[in-house]
Amino acid sequence: MSYVSATHDRMIAGLILPCRVAGVDLAAGLVRVCDGAGWTSAWVRWHSQAAGKARHWRAPSLGEQGVLISPSGEPAQGTFVPGLYGDAGAQPDNREHVEVWRFDDGGSLVYDWQAKRYSISLPSGTVAIQVGASSALVTDSAITGKADSITLTGAITLNGDVQINGASLKHNGVNVGSTHVHLGVLPGPGATAPPQ
């Protein structure tokens, strides 16, 4: 075989290489990949879901399978496309109407558009939502909401103690808090007037 033919064969063979992650440089956003037979690449970029005005970050895992796509068959110029199911991670679901992220700690993000249900599950920890100065914080043992104004519409059921730390408590515009007063207070069995 001539040198030219051998070079062409090598370049064609190097266009798309099945491989797995051998190293990750998080600060630089680069990975090294290997073919499992002794070859390891130079540091190359990996593909993300988005890298424009909207950007996505998920670092490939060590051992994660994917393919190295190399222009002109030069692996040093390649980019790694992660996400082939294999030894490092099996498929997390098998339903066509579900998008799922499952994480090593047991957490998951699941959207089932057939059931119209979005589920966020953490084994423990914190979920924080921040919009401007308003926030909601969910932990293992408490839910805390903070905003200039909170409006609840609909029937409300509270099972447990209620503690109110505020300057006023009103019902239908009438003060029923700790500073409310009653008129018509007379000794004896008579009833008081409504709160003022």
How should each PLM-predicted stretch be described?
Residues S108-V110, K116-S119, A128, S135, ...:
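Conserved, well-structured core segments that form or line functional sites
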Residues M1-R117, P195-Q196:
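Exposed beta-strand/loop interface patches that mediate assembly or binding
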Residues S2-V4, C19, Q130-Q196:
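Intrinsic-disorder/coil detector with helix-boundary
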Residues V24, G83, Q114, P123, ...:
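Fold-independent oxyanion-binding glycine-rich loops
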